[in-house]
Amino acid sequence: MIGYNKFMKKFLAILVLGLFIAYYLFGLNELAVIFWAIAFCAGYVSLSASIRIWQKREIRKYHKKHKTIPRTYEDLEKHLKSSISVVSHLKKKLTLPNVTLLAATSVEIEEHQISLKISSQNIEFGAVKLLSSSLPEKKYSDIEYVSVKPMGRSDANRFLIEDLHKYFETSHCLYVEADGFVVNADLWKKEFLEFDYIGAPWPNEIQMDPNLVGSPGLPGPIPILNMKENCVGGGGFSLRSHKLLKTVSKINYDSLKFPIKNEDLLICHYLYKDMIDKGIRFAPPKLAAQFAIECDPLHLYGQDVNSVFGFHARHMRDYFLKEYMRRAPIGKW
């Protein structure tokens, strides 16, 4: 759909320009120019709407046909009949030698491995690492498996703040979780590496879900966070510099008294001013919106699934996995 939109916009622009050239150079009647311009614009809108309706119907049909989401990457390979590996060799990979792709987890280990494999399909990273307390059912030669202690939710947040910097040596790491991975490798921008932190932008206000916060049993109502000072951004699919992680590693996580201790909120919200004072650079929201999507795209920067490098959202995972199964075999991932 994105390719179609780009083509139609260019075609429409050239057409309107041609009409005005015809008017000025060949004396075409002014009313005729206006009529044809309006007619073609209306036709474009109508055709675009029809294509979108058709596309949504086809996606629904596809999802109905493929109800089962693969649990392991091996299952995913079997579903695709190994065609993804053939397609990968046909496409020129993006090379990011200064970025380590990594995940750190004690839960959903197979799902985290899927995120690593999909993210690295069309990108050659400096390294790819799975930091986990146990191994997945099948190991892959392009992933380095690193053993870490079992982690609960608070342990995971503490680990990302205090210890993550120890596990990579490149200038940046691309941190992914089970519900986030690269979806459009060709939308990588070199500007991403100019910043110490970039993640999907949040809304200006966040009503926290008590089941997802890093500090269970919070007294009183869950706060509404005002993110207007900095809305960048979601940690579940984020690019972080080694400088940033060395800086936050000096923080004693257990001593922090904030009501919510999710690591991305600590870095990007509660400790934002401290980070800025230490020379940490956060990507501007408009660039972050090109990096990843996490919230409802209708409310943030006109994002859609074809306009971002990656995503992070539990409610989007099944959709993107099905899109991957549909698009990867024909070289569209």
Predicted regions and their residues:
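Transmembrane-cytosolic junction motif
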Residues: 46-64
